[in-house]
Amino acid sequence: MYYFPVSALLIEYLILTIVDSRDSYGYEISQTIKIVADIKESTLYPILKKLEKGGYVTTYSQEFQGRKRKYYSITEAGKEQLVFLNQEWNSYRDTIDGIIEGRIRN
C-alpha cells in the first residue's frame, strides 16, 4: 500500500480522534494510525508528549498482564482542539475534493 505523507498536525488530529472515542495506550494508537500512515513510534511519542504538555491529553498507568501501560485520555482543552482540527480537516478535504473534481482552479 502507498501512503501519502502526513504532517505532525495530522498525526495530532488522528491521536485526538482516537482518544476521544476511548482512552488508549501508545502502541494501540500507533497501530491505528498505521492503517493510513507509515509512522514509527519515534515519531508518535514526541507528538503524544507535546499533546500532554499542551494540556490536550492526560496520562495514567494501568497494569495489563503484569506490565504497566501508559494510557492517554483527552481533556476538555483536547476536545476543543479536536473540534477546531475537525473543522480545518473538513475545509482542507473540501478544497482537495474541489481540485480533483475540477471545481477549484487558480
Residue ranges and their predicted role:
Residues 2-43:
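N-terminal helix-turn-helix DNA-binding core of bacterial DNA-binding proteins
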Residues 31, 76, 91-94:
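Generic recognition of well-ordered alpha-helical segments
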Residues 48-50:
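Short, hydrophobic-biased segments on the C-terminal half of alpha helices
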Residues 64-86:
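Basic, amphipathic "hinge/linker" alpha-helix immediately C-terminal to the N-terminal HTH DNA-binding motif
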Residues 83-106:
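Amphipathic alpha-helical dimerization/coiled-coil segments
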